[in-house]
Amino acid sequence: MRIGILTIFPDFVKVIKEYGVIAQAVENNLLQIDIFNLRDFTTDKHKVVDDYAYGGGPGMVMKPEPFFKFFEYYNQMFGKPYVVLTSPQGKTLNNEIAKKLSAQERLLIICGRYEGIDERVMKFVDEEISIGDYVLTGGELPAMVITDVVSRFIPGVVEEESVKNDSFYNDLLDHPHYTRPRNIDGLEVPEVLLSGNHEEIELWRRKESLRKTISKRPDLFLKHQFDEVDKKALLLLFKELIKDAK
């Protein structure tokens, strides 16, 4: 998969491909990340990418010409990409959106800045995506988040089992995790995790995953499609809750 990020601050976003599993994926040719500087597609000596808004109002608007020149270049060089604009007006990023984006051969993320982008640039945009109901100074951080989330669904970037166990993968939050030592400050690792009984461990993990989801994200719990393991885990959880309530 090829992911491109179009920004006026390339040094800001280049770190996304320099660390961790994404850097390994790039090194192993599982993922190609291209970072483009929008200023390289300007025609004036000052490389200006913004201008005053028609009709007045505060702030500046990103000019359309550099975008038109960029997409002419990109389409000739690589082929037409699936284009995402980072925007507080967009759909909120989630696992389903990330999985869909990971199936694209070429993904291009535009980092918005200033008051916004000239509306005529929207002819190139397939989808607007937000990472939450708040406003940032620019789209670089959301672009990095989108890149990170999408990359996890590319085969080989992380182990498939790790992805399946992530929070939200099946509309459930992740179960608790423990490592050594077995005891710290009187806090013990649950005995079931030391038992070696993989069936009981899986059941305990699912139970705790359901407990977390009910407590923290009941909206996800209500969307979840329950399997037989879920039903057994819920029965255990309800028994524990009834016992604790007495």
Swiss-Prot record:
Keyword Transferase among record annotations: yes
The reaction(s) this protein catalyses: guanosine(37) in tRNA + S-adenosyl-L-methionine = N(1)-methylguanosine(37) in tRNA + S-adenosyl-L-homocysteine + H(+)
Main enzyme class: transferase
Gene: trmD
Role according to the record: Specifically methylates guanosine-37 in various tRNAs.
Protein name, UniProt field: tRNA (guanine-N(1)-)-methyltransferase
Any one of the GO BP annotations: tRNA N1-guanine methylation
GO molecular function, one term: tRNA (guanine(37)-N1)-methyltransferase activity
Keywords: Cytoplasm, Methyltransferase, S-adenosyl-L-methionine, Transferase, tRNA processing
Family recorded in the similarity comment: Belongs to the RNA methyltransferase TrmD family.
Source species taxonomy: Bacteria, Thermotogati, Thermotogota, Thermotogae, Thermotogales
Organism: Fervidobacterium nodosum (strain ATCC 35602 / DSM 5306 / Rt17-B1)
